[in-house]
Amino acid sequence: MRLLHVVVATVSLTGAITSLIAAQHYNVSSDVIGGIEKEDFGVGCNSRTKYPTAADTSKLQPRFAYLITNSLADFIAVHFIKFNLPDNDFVQIRAADPSAVDNRVLRYRGNESNGVFFADALSTKSVIVELFTNASSSAQKTNSSKCVGFAVDSYQYLGEGSTLNGSKEEVCGADNSREASCYSGYTNAFRASNAVVRLLIKKSTGSFFCTGWLIGSEGHLITNNHCISTQSHASNTEFEFMAQGSSCSINCEGARACFGSIRASYATLIYADATLDYALVKLPINLSGQYGYLRLRSSGAVMNERVYVPQHPAGWGKRIAMKSDNGFGTVTSLTMGGCAPNQVAYYLDTQGGSSGSPVLSWSDNAVVALHHCGGCPNTAINSYKLVNDMKWRGILPANACT
């Protein structure tokens, strides 16, 4: 469990740092799996560095600092295997480069964070992990059943698009999807895309990109079960809104490109269903008033109706797939097999990371299917199945369907 304080500024420190240890991994080592690099550092908790016990009168200088550098990194997300600090102490993580685009400063405080968790990912190739203490540790409250301090065992630095059982979500012919802002003139569709969110899910096997979207008016979000299937997944997911270019000319083709606003770093899992491949979570803050929300069509998709898919393929900035090689995208089947029986099919372009995207009807901007599987055509779970299942379980959010 942890609460995160974010300061949007870089930190400038003067004077000597008590302890600065550099771990510079310029190349991937042989034991790296899925964008994970092993580490072994910390303060207290049986690490090589003892936890400070003398009072610290300075609020500017860290008592400990550790540098992580990886030239292959798209981001760096530190994994804490132990975290139990005195109430007023905190660990701070920031980009080592003061000119880094992602200039957030992440702070995890002793009275708000504990246990095992991933820090938020910073989009940079080098970070500094620092410990700040504000008073004698002996005078502050801690969990007496645990060691005092923190320990890091690894960090994640690359993400891949999540797919269902290795199925390939595909571009069908030429990639006809476009940057979301290219469709700003299509007012209703562009407004609907505001509810679509880029997800970075940090799992024990690595980091994965997916797409999710706000459903109903109570602060819920839906994505695929193969993206989020456990509370641990939900607790280690970053929910990034408005990750898109401000104009059509801006190229957002890159993992975590066109940085948006990470409004939540965890969620509560309401239910995940493997058969229908959906996961319903609730964010710690209701953002439906700010970004709007989408609604499922209770009657489901209609054969040959025009559809479009706002999405974050490969963790890129938001794109909208509205056209195929043969014109505007339409529902081409309601009975497609493959990843599931009786799927909705369409020839709109997707990639790994598009999983969980809404398939919306052009006529009423209702969600008619939940994209989840690749191939040409690409396929999705019909919306009426989701509505019926959530109603039966008593978990359908308010204003979640038409």
Curated annotation (Swiss-Prot):
This is Secreted RxLR effector protein 73. Secreted effector that completely suppresses the host cell death induced by cell death-inducing proteins. A motif (RxLR) lies at residues 104-107. PANTHER family: LYSYL ENDOPEPTIDASE. Residues 1-23 form the signal peptide. Transmembrane segments: none annotated. It comes from Plasmopara viticola (Downy mildew of grapevine). One of its GO terms (cellular component) is extracellular region. Its main location: secreted. Has the canonical translocation RxLR motif, but lacks the canonical EER motif, which characterizes most oomycete effectors identified so far. The gene is RXLR73. Belongs to the RxLR effector family. It is found in: Secreted; Host cell. InterPro entries: Peptidase_S1_PA, Peptidase_S1_PA_chymotrypsin. Glycans are attached at residues 27, 111, 134, 143, 165, 286. Keywords: Glycoprotein, Secreted, Signal, Virulence.
